[in-house]
């Protein structure tokens, strides 16, 4: 079923131009590039890697490759799964630029856009890296889905290059994932 649906997606997007694909990828799409990379890994068929690359949003990727943070105002949980896909593709293709883009994103979000509990957005969007006022003043706290996806990215990065990510892997689930579910 997974392969059939992937083939279906390849078929229905085959007539789209590169610009049309990039326009479509502005919307939240759940990290399809990662899924298609997984299908490539499962099947050994490189056509799925090409599909994964085609579903990679260049507006986010290209600045990350050159170490530029353009995240302010972006819908956070739309971007994180895209980056997970970049990392998955990088791992399968040994693409150092895409790997570095994922690492730069992680470092930027963790070290410049997150608060101590691990949250990194308010009202689902990245705040300015130099102004955390919205995170302190807004009644809506960080999204747990962002935190979950950042944990997934952390795990992927840690598996290929163990770093100082261990405190994030061990502490953030308790401060951001489990805490909102305590009804006492």
Please name every model-derived segment:
Residues 1-184:
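Glycan-recognition and catalytic cores of secretory/periplasmic carbohydrate-active enzymes
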């Amino acid at each position: 079923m997974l392969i059939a649906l992937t083939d279906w997606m390849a078929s229905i997007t085959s007539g789209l131009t590169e610009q049309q694909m990039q326009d479509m990828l502005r919307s939240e799409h759940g990290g399809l590039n990662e899924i298609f990379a997984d299908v490539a890994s499962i099947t050994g068929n490189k056509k799925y890697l090409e599909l994964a690359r085609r579903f990679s949003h260049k507006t986010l990727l290209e600045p990350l490759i050159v170490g530029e943070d353009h995240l302010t105002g972006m819908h956070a949980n739309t971007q994180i799964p895209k980056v997970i896909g970049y990392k998955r593709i990088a791992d399968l293709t040994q693409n150092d630029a895409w790997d570095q883009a994922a690492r730069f994103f992680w470092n930027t979000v963790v070290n410049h856009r997150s608060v101590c509990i691990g949250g990194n957005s308010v009202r689902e969007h990245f705040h300015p890296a130099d102004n955390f006022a919205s995170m302190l003043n807004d009644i809506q706290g960080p999204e747990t889905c962002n935190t979950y996806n950042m944990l997934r990215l952390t795990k992927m990065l840690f598996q290929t290059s163990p770093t100082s990510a261990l405190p994030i892997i061990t502490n953030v689930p308790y401060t951001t994932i489990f805490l909102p579910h305590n009804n006492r």
